[in-house]
Amino acid sequence: MKLLHSIKAHDDKVWSLSSHPTLPLLATASTDKCSNIYRLSCSNASSSSSSSSPPSPPSPPSSSSPRRNFPQIAHLEDTHRRSVRSVSFKPPMGGIDHQDSNILDLPALASGSFDSTISIWGIDEPDDDNTYEIEEIIANQKEFLASPGNEWNLMAVIEGHENEIKAVDWNFSGRYLASCSRDKTVWIWETDPETLEEFECVAVLTDHTQDVKHVTWHPTRNLLASSSYDDTIRVYKQEFDDDEWSCVGMIDGHEGTVWCSKFESPKSPKAKDGTTRLVSVSDDLSARVWASKDNTGFNGGSEQLQSQSQTHLPSSIRHNAEEMVWEQESTLPQIHTHAIYSVAWSSSSGKIATAGSDGRIVVYKETNAGWEVENIQESAHGVYEINCVIWAKLDLDQEVLISGGDDGNVNIWEV
């Protein structure tokens, strides 16, 4: 692993990171009650050009402005009274694979806080000032929407949880936002992904018996996993009529707090048709991969994506609240010596990365013989613990690994 860049993002702990699925944007969450947004650009990948200040409004791709290493483009503050614990970018409307390139899809960010609220942030549609035609902006969204010239504004504050929010995550289409809390509940909020004007609570899930640490959506399905201090993972999906959410599986193989879990993307090189896989990490020092066979098809609600690479039964013969049977497929080689706080599963390479309180980052790759260690980065944040690790892509589509730690730094790694 090679350290490409280190950002001194905050003066206090970095709790969470989120990269936008299609734009070169990175968001951070910190104990300092703020979130920052950075552009995922690296000058090492471009030639030098004339020096000038970035124009405003945003410049099109043909601009001769020099590229900077991961410039900060927004500082979101004065909203939360306590730590911002989690951030999550809203995916494009309809999902990454069904994005309409003919509409302007503005980015939005959800931030969950220890003050028990969620804030929603976004940018306004560029004004028609005759500088650029809207068609030009739509055609070059990657440049315009990730520009420092955009002002990020508070769009909504969501209330409902009784205690600290530990995680937030959007579903694949941006229609649903999930949140979890120390109050032992998981909430699902529904909104119009185009306007984000209202957020209606459509489910309060109370299956966990202790603090819920993390929630994560499947990349292409309305399938939600929650991880808890009660040592279990719960899996939820919609009933056939889309009005109810049910717990359809419980994974109880860990012997300590489950801090984080992530679904495998159907795009992963090792993904198999008819099998859903999930990786989880825990206080018990283990990272485990779980698998569930979709023998009777999958009822993921009206938004269920039906990719050509997957086989699903017609909705007319699917069963409501069909139980998912999860089996432990493998335990990754144990490297960590203290609690593992975060795990990320790359949709491009299929690699899994883990990080935690021992300061290590471990990267695993799957072979025909099973999972093996590819990289170990000791003291990735010096003597500090690592709270989050994610896979992301730079603006030139290079995949990187990004970590956030107690030192307030965000480190970008080439793997």
From Swiss-Prot:
Residues 45-70 are annotated as: Disordered. It is found in: Cytoplasm; Nucleus. Coiled coil: none annotated. Its main location: cytoplasm. Signal peptide: none annotated. Residues 54-63 have a biased composition (Pro residues). Gene3D superfamilies: YVTN repeat-like/Quinoprotein amine dehydrogenase. The keyword Nucleus applies. It comes from the Eukaryota. InterPro entries: CIAO1/Cia1, G-protein_beta_WD-40_rep, WD40/YVTN_repeat-like_dom_sf, WD40_repeat_CS, WD40_repeat_dom_sf, WD40_rpt. HAMAP family: ciao1 (MF_03037). Essential component of the cytosolic iron-sulfur (Fe/S) protein assembly machinery. Required for the maturation of extramitochondrial Fe/S proteins. Interacts with NAR1. This is Probable cytosolic iron-sulfur protein assembly protein 1. It comes from Lodderomyces elongisporus (strain ATCC 11503 / CBS 2605 / JCM 1781 / NBRC 1676 / NRRL YB-4239).
